[in-house]
Amino acid sequence: MCLYCYLVCNYNKCSYLRVYVNTDYMLDKLIEKSHKTEKECTFEIGSNSDLILENRITGNLIKTIKEFGRKGRGCITFPTKFAMVDDLLGLEHNGKVIFRMSVNPESIIKNIEIGTSPLEMRIEAVNKMCEAGYKVGLLIAPVIFTDGWKELYLELLDTLYSRLSEKAKSEIFIEVIFMTYSYVQNAINEQAFPNAPKLYDKELMTGRGRGKYYYRQEYRDEAEKFLREEITKRFSGTEIVYVV
């Protein structure tokens, strides 16, 4: 589980895997909605759990990709921190699925994104999905200002550049999201995981609405400039969709 995940607040002390049983109804409604929009839309389907992980238990993602690929209009998209994609590679997605892999420096994965796939495996999953014809993106998220964060993210970008396939590098898009961290999350983690890394830093963060801590604007602006420049140095033709 990830110590910063908002699902920790939903479930109190653990981001449990949520599995729905009315998936046929939900999928029918999704496909129906896709045909009623004025223009083609992209539907985010991965907000309640990591669908790659859930798929290992339920097979729901396989069914969703196949059905939306055949009947849906527009695209569906989901993020993941897991690399178990082999079951998806041969599916007829018809270009209607956007696969987004979340990436972070290996030390953050090991100590803060506990139990998720290592960086090398995540990159290999991106290469596999790209080769299988899926639209693919990298989600550099959340950016966390740990000690030596600039060096860590430079190393991450270098690793991505050296390990991604040429096909993936030519087709990916990139999203960047800075960490937000709620008051409730901080209290839960202090009680449930007293030995875990401390994510709240009063010097770097400030409260701003809805019970959340954000990085102070001056630090965030500096980091955005730094990351945009370093991403562009390595991935000059790649779209940075947003930095938030």
Locate predicted features:
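Structural preference for beta-strand elements that scaffold enzyme active sites
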Residues: 40-44, 75-77, 96-100, 135-139, ...
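Structured alpha-helical segments in the cores of large, soluble enzyme domains
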Residues: 29-36, 87-92, 119-132, 227
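Short, electropositive alpha-helical surface patch
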Residues: 58, 99-102, 149-165, 194-201
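Auxiliary Fe-S-binding modules of radical SAM enzymes
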Residues: 161-244
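Non-cysteine beta-strand/loop elements that form the S-adenosyl-L-methionine
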Residues: 86-106, 173-180, 198-203
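Conserved radical SAM core fold
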Residues: 49-52, 83-86, 99-116, 142-147, ...
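Conserved Radical SAM active-site core
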Residues: 4-100
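A beta-strand-loop signature enriched in Asp, Gly, Thr, and Trp
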Residues: 127, 131-180
